[in-house]
Amino acid sequence: MPLSTGLTLSSLNVMEKADNHYNMMTKQPPALSPVDMVSSRRGFNPIAFTPWPVTILSSLVYLAFIIPIIVVHHLVPPAPKESPEGVDLKEAWHDLQHLTRQYHPYNSHSNDEVHQWLLKRIHAISASSSARSGDTTGPDIFIFDDNQTNLTFSSVGVAAKSITGVYFESKNILVYIRGAEDDQEEWWESPDGEPSGKGGVLVNAHYDSVSTGYGATDNGVGVISTLQLLKYFTTPGHYPRKGLVLLFNDGEEDFLNGAYAFSQHPLSKFTHTFLNIEGAGAGGRAVLFRSTDTEVTRFYGNTEHPFGTVLARDAFQLGFIRSETDYHVFDGVFGMRGLDVAFMEPRSRYHTDQDDARHTSIDSVWHMLSAAIKTTEGLVSYTGDAFDGDNGNDGKLNNGAGTLGVWFDFYGSSFAVFELNTLFGHSVALLVVAPLLLIATCVTLYTLDKMYMFSMYTYLSESGGQVSLYGLRGLFRFPLILGISTALTIGLAFLLMKANPFIIYSSPYAVWNPSALHRAYAFTWMFGMMWVLLVIATVYQKQHGIASSYFIVFYFAGVSIATWISYLELFGLPTTQDYARRQIRITDRTPSSDSRLLAPSADELPPSGSAAGHDFNPEDVEDEEPTESTSLLRGQQRTTFANYASARSNSDGNISTNASLHPKDHRLEQRWSINLISSAWILQFLFVAPIVIILLGQLGLFLTSATYQIGADGGSQLVIYVGIAVLSVLILLPLFPFIHRFTYHIPTFLLFVLIGTLVYNLTAFPFSHSNRLKVAFVQEIDLETGKNQASLVGVEPYIHDIVRTIPSTTGKEVSCISRGYGGRAKCSWDGLKPRVVDAPYKEWITYNISQAKDDKHTRFEISGKNTRACKILFDSPIADFKVLGSVTDERIPHTGPKGVSEIRLWSRTWENTWTVDVEWTKKNANRQGKVMCIWSDDNDLKVIPALDEIRNFAPAWAAITKLRDGLVEGSHSFKL
């Protein structure tokens, strides 16, 4: 809703009144527009450039396009009442409820239960599919419970933080549905086996949740959608032509571990394309987040309700979105080509206890499932060569080379996909052709003596007499008011950032800011402004592969056409010479103190059928009632060449303002404007407004949904507010050339809306039960000293309000620090003792450190009770490490140029003992750090009392999530 509309319209009204005052003082000739002639002689014109048609039609067009965009964005298409062939929605919903009964992170006993349940469901679906088909022509189904694979790798290329080494043991489940055209041999049984023929398709969904969320959308819906894909593609009539691999991976939440482990499975050499289904919200529509190329994106376009824009991919590429999904591994490590489809809002429920089945719907399930079915069906049915062949990437799959693409949906029902090179080509063409076309039009107008724009005067060729054209009037009004209104809009963004920065968290649409500008020269200024933006966009398209500037191409195209129409209108005007002659004759017949009481000569009369629109008739100017100042010889006035100076003076003087010929709406415009086409404005408006509303409206809503709650994670709120302010101006910009024709009703209404929303935004509390502020929990214990600190990390000042409600902080010192937490503060206090291990602190971890004889290597042996996740942290980075029994992959380096500062150890076995050999750097004089184990299972009450206490006593507007992999961290310090 508008925040700055009232301010903008006020500035517009001031400018308009000042301009009108100037016109009256200078006695500018009034305009007589064709619509006035039509209105007075032929009746009402419903599309004339007059206040009511402009107000009504413009408002209807905006409402007609904006309302459906908002509805589509927020309402999920309903699921069918009867399940389509090959799927069972009731079964899917029941599976989701079962899957999300408990938190099930990798480091929890419930994760093992989910693993076993998935195996049973997969076997049951496979068995029922065989029984259902009743024939032997169905595809072969192979189920792999991967409890053998392990891998050592590092965080290089995953996050821009300190280098972290990882050892992980797989608990992945894979299902291979053999395609009709696949190799019929079980090639994976051979150690050196290689698939033959065309590559297959991978569908991936991770089945672990975070320790503080039930994982309904992250990633329960993805898991049960993948189960339904198994049912669908083993149903007669839907058998795949190319092989389909369904990967249920474990450990995604902790470091994309399951996807990395898949690299060691033989089937990773078979899949050339992929679909990753994920969740970063808690319901709504599933969004196409990313795609590797144009060719694979076209298969997503087959879905019934596509939803997404290339803006998301560019945000990942530019680093605005810092979180990662398994897409990163499949694309970056394997070189597969595919798609990333995920839920994205509301972020306030993401990774919290509200990510449950209660807060999603069967409609959301169907939206993701239907997209997965159509996309996968297209991929497994494709038999071309687009995804096969050498691509020049050594060490990666030979799956052909794709082209960068551009994509966006239209109202969630159709999908546009084309190559970035196509966008670049059109951008260059528009940059060249549009200015040349306008220049050619201007040259033609000058040649025909009809270029009224940019001209203040014209001079009669036969006498040198000067007549005012007022062609420069309003030239600088557009940039002036654009600058003022934009500054006010952005100023309000800074005001909100200062006074109530998190109001967008619960009220994202209360901060949207429309603007209004005047029409004079507006399209010409818009043309120049959009041309500059298109130049910048074209450079980024070519040099950085940024495709989300596609809206600028369409925007500029529409503005170019509208601007050209404005120039084409000038061809309907008389030449400036004819206009000047007529003005002098009319002026000579107008009473003034220095009028000559002479009649015009014959050669001074305008030609018959002149461009002025009708033959000249002296009676045309004798429509006023005689007064005491009326000349007695009014019809006999004439001007000689000697009197052109006085004629020129009077051309700026008193002119008849008979209301029947000069309605009040146009009385102050240039007289020559009577020949402009009154209804041309509607063409200009329709060329610009609809496409801008659709493209920028969808982009604006997408951007708002993706970012309005990132402030809880330490993201900059100012960037969001300024972004919304800029989008507001761009979306309302098509109204600027016409806004002066609006009646006062809409500006007045929006002024009141401005006042109301501004007061609300400055005073309302930004959080609520449905839009909770996320704060992150961790409990850190020094197992040697027994020091026990519970901590919450969140944005200030609200984190202090939350901490004060916790009973165990009463009368105790609470320490808060803000450095190193990305715009958030960490508040710590003496916490309640956890019961994750039924033993004294010193017995929670068993470890041994032995120094090698060369003084360059050290062996660590570490094990923790009731856990399968431990760490070794070093105060100074080490050069290298090796976990006994592990493998490495040259595609995935396990160390980096600056060494490793942390080693994370994950085992599928509880209370496992890891043996880690560490190589120190030459500079490692300070060989000290910590051995640590973590506990993440919070399904049993009273296991982590400090967390239970926070959940019980924190305000209803606060939500608890995890800070790191473990909810409880126990550590011993070491120094060598």
Curated annotation (Swiss-Prot):
Residues the entry annotates as binding Zn(2+) 1: 206, 218, 278
Transmembrane stretches, start-end: 52-72, 400-420, 428-448, 478-498, 520-540, 551-571, 676-696, 719-739, 746-766
Annotated EC: 3.4.-.-
Cytoplasmic face of the membrane: 1-51, 421-427, 499-519, 572-675, 740-745
Molecular-function annotations in GO: metal ion binding; metalloexopeptidase activity
Membrane topology label: Multi-pass membrane protein
Coiled coil: none
Pfam families per UniProt: Peptidase_M28, PFF1_C, PFF1_TM
Glycosylation sites per record: 147, 150, 848
Active site: 252 (proton acceptor)
Cystine residue pairs: none
Cofactor binding: number and manner: Binds 2 Zn(2+) ions per subunit.
Key words, A-Z: Glycoprotein, Hydrolase, Membrane, Metal-binding, Metalloprotease, Protease, Transmembrane, Transmembrane helix, Vacuole, Zinc
Binding site for Zn(2+) 2: 218, 253, 351
SUPFAM superfamilies in UniProt: Zn-dependent exopeptidases (SSF53187)
Name of the top EC class for this enzyme: hydrolase
Chief place of localization: membrane
Region (Disordered) residue spans: 590-633
GO annotation, cellular component aspect: vacuolar membrane
Function: May be involved in vacuolar sorting and osmoregulation.
Record-given protein name: Vacuolar membrane protease
Organism: Arthroderma otae (strain ATCC MYA-4605 / CBS 113480)
